[in-house]
Amino acid sequence: MKHTALLLLLLCSLTLQAQDAGLKVLDHSDFLIWNTIQDRQIAADGRIVTYRLVPGEGNPTLKIYDATTTATSQIQRVSKSTIDYDGKFIFGLITPHRDSLRALERKKVEKKEWPADTLFITSGVAGSVLRIPNVAEYKYPAKKGDWLAYSIKPQTVPADTTKEKDATKEKKKSKKEIVHLIVRQLSTGLEDTLRNVKEYVWAEKAAMLVAVTASSDSTETAGVAYWSNHEWQYIKKQKAEYAKLSLAMDGNQIAFLGNPDTTKAQVQPWELYYFDFRTDSATSIAAKNKSALPLVSQHAEPRWSEDGKYLFYGRAQMPVIKDTTLLPDEIVDVEIWTTEDKEIYPVQNVKKAQEEKRSYTYVYDTQSKQHTAICSPAWESAVFTPDRNGRFVMVYTDQPYQKESSWTGDARKDLAKVDLLTGAVIPFRKGILTNPRISPGDKFAYGYSDIDSTWWTYQFATGTFSLMKRDGLPSFYDEENDVPTHPNSYGIAGWIKDDQSLILYDRYDMWAWSGEGSKAPVTLTKGREQKLVHRYIKADAEEKFLSPSAPWLIHLKDDTNKSTGYSWFNPSSFSLDSAYVLSDFEHSRQVNKSRSADTYLFTKENFATFPDLQLSGDRLKTSVKISDANPQQKQYAWGSIQLYHWMDWDSVMRTGLLVLPPGFDTLRSYPTIVNFYEKSSDELHNHPTPAPHRSTINYAFYASRGYVIFNPDISYKIGLPGESAYQIVMSGTSSLVNDRIADRENLALQGHSWGGYQIAYILTRTNMFKCAEAGAAVVNMTSAYDGIRWETGKGRQFQYEKEQSRLGKTLWQDPNLYINNSPLFKINKIETPLLLLH
């Protein structure tokens, strides 16, 4: 009671200080008014930027910014918006008021009875806003401007301008949940209507749309129709079920699935249909047969190569037929676990629905009219180039290694290439632990080999497999790895055009590797000496490869003080623009470039600065802030943050984050919350937007209310995770007390999951803290060791042996290791008041 009164008195005095300065103290109700920025977009010419302000509670607002006039307009309650490909129009959906929807929810009104959204269309800040009510959804060609399709409920359909007047009268309402589809040309306002639509899709680069219609009575047509030049044309009128519509990118070819069987047979005879505008109707090109994969899969969506040559689809095995003659009490329902299974039963159970829909990829060559198997039960997965134009495809299987993955956590793979010209499947690597990929030019398969801790390539043309030589070079894997398993790579930037080189990362620099094992990679940057991290930014969303001549946008980060900035790298001269400036902000690595102009959209933030949008028209030399998401922040007492360094008990220099309350007085000590997980110092300049969180505290909130927050970086010793955390947390907290920053009498711990475990362990070793909260803490590693993660079905053993728990041995190899690291067995030593959250 005495301690509680003291803490309340301290908080009251700190609150009064903030009030004396004329500033508010953050309260829980403030979480509701703080905005986040979502769905930012920039037009092709860089003139228009849109984004949504979404409050903690309430209706979102779409903001439209015009870079030419610097004017901003807004539309309330927008849940989704799009700038068309040409950048001339903005459209989206306006939802009913949130309060109205919540009232319907409280009355338990079914969602299908809720009021529909309203479609809006505008040309920009100064343009008028057209509103069309009762819209279910909209779609548009991803890379073709001026066109939009939207669906509405039947009772609100306007007259169809493509039909005779007497045909526009409303027919008897269908019992089916069907919509009417309206295609609109944005520049003219002309609209065409197709009634009773079940499904529709646009071509990506053309004003071409295909739809499935249903008949509500004898006067209407059911089938598949395409729309072009303001006309609808049916390409399949047979009464059947149609699905999985797909258009080639240029709109010149159409594929879809059809099922003419109207019975309820367990096995439905789906067929693949193809249409290329040289015929009057679509024709079946794949159907049920007597092969090992007899069925066309209804679950695999047909997909086109970018050049339209290849059509990829799925075939499937015959499913197990249910015996419908059995009574419910005659059906056996039992789980059988056996050591002979490739995967443990819970994994099988999780995968059951997926396996029932399993399909194997085939390809139809539209030029040769040949079908080629890519995948099979022996090679169940495929990897393609992004455009799928290439002659070669990589396939892989993890089946031989599924059993061992039960205790390793990850399955190794066998790899093979498929030649689409010949259909030949040629294995080229067994038992490699990797995430395989294909270079954009289709010359190499490649990936990072976890076991070898290096990159590999396989040259399709020569059949040569190579591991990258790294003798005498820095590590291309995590230098700070403190987990008893293979370290992760630092990743890649991508490939230079025509697969000339693969651009790799080490801890600080970028390297170019030709992909040939006989050649070592060449360093492109010189960041290691300065501890300056170089990372490539893909600002162009449509970019497939790195240019061999045009400058690359580079994100720079000082690994010591965490300052960041941007620069440009010249790939021709291997030189970095030295005019870069780093500042105490986190400059985002998500940068959006307008497609046809050198205009860039990005954010920068720090503890006190919200990540508002910045727009630059001079290649990021300068920028203008174009949003002001939370102007109310200036009314509140806000803390500050810095790096804190101290010497631990082993005389090793340690680092952590130290958040200080507003008006921090060096002559006073403050109540302190120690909150940590693993390492967080890289987040020095992240902005703590006030918001509730399921597992951690909000730093801005507690700083505003007078707390110091300490977040130490934890470095782990294998086999001693709890003790590692104890020594670093205790030495760091003691240092704060000795520096008279932290009040020795008012210290607290807070953490969740892995952080919760570490807190539970620390409390068995010390009574230094006044109170603690641990969420989802595993306190008994012996019982948790054989647990199951039900979302994946996998066992948890490998998590303790070789992943986050870092014990490094099995329970049977060293049972005391598990006991000593389990707080449960020392719980009698805990005297600190502890709040447990589960």
Segments the model singles out, each with a brief description of its role:
Residues 689-838:
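Active-site-proximal cap/loop segments of hydrolase catalytic domains
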